[in-house]
A protein has these predicted regions:
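Catalytic helix-loop patch of NAD(P)-dependent Rossmann-fold dehydrogenases
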Residues: 1-32, 43-44
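Rossmann-like NAD(P)H-binding beta-loop-alpha module
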Residues: 40
Length: 195
């Protein structure tokens, strides 16, 4: 995103630009990886899947922004790991076709690249919640709220470049991923069934 609309995105982009400068100055092969809505076991407890699962199990309401109209490219953690491993085995190289007098924004004189790692199949937030409900066999109490400032309505990862470079293919659809997470969550927190 060359025109970020929030500080979080701006910090990510500035990190990529600093990494490019470092790669250029010291000719260190560098790959920036952009992860798209990572979820799964051992994830961050402040993320939606954790918060929604915990609140549904405790009978508390969940806050759903943009009145549930978000689309997210949910990517299961195993698919992220696959992308990292494959990418690490194929470092970027200097592009001899780069022209300093007529620079193409998609190329670099440094051994540098940015790759998206995602599922490339956006799912509605409401579908995601339905899958959580189904796997818990409980209904969520939903509090619909307007979209938050700086939030985007849809995320979608174009994974064509990582597919062509390292044969990355996401293998986990959201139905399987949410099911795996719920099973892990219940075992980890010693709950065999919802309260």
């Amino acid at each position: 995103a060359n025109h970020p609309i929030q500080f979080y995105a701006a910090t990510k982009r500035s990190n990529e630009l600093m990494a490019h400068s470092y790669s250029h100055m010291f000719q260190i092969p560098t790959t920036g990886l952009r992860f798209f809505t990572v979820y799964g076991p051992w994830g961050r407890p402040d993320m939606a899947l954790f918060k929604f699962t915990k609140n549904i199990l405790e009978g508390k309401s969940i806050e759903v922004f943009n009145h549930g109209n978000h689309l997210r490219d949910f990517t299961y953690v195993d698919d992220i790991v696959q992308g990292i491993v494959k990418t690490s085995r194929n470092p970027p190289k200097y592009d001899p076709s780069f022209d300093h007098f007529d620079p193409d924004q998609g190329k670099s004189s440094a051994p540098f690249r940015i790759l998206n790692i995602g599922n490339s199949n956006p799912v509605t937030l409401m579908r995601y919640i339905e899958l959580i409900e189904h796997n818990l066999n409980l209904k969520a109490k939903i509090q619909f709220l307007p979209i938050q400032d700086g939030d985007v309505e849809k995320t979608y990862s174009d994974i064509s470049r990582i597919q062509s470079l390292v044969s990355y293919t996401p293998n986990t659809d959201v139905e399987v991923g949410v099911k795996n997470f719920i099973k892990w969550y219940l075992q980890y927190y010693h709950q065999t069934e919802p309260k």
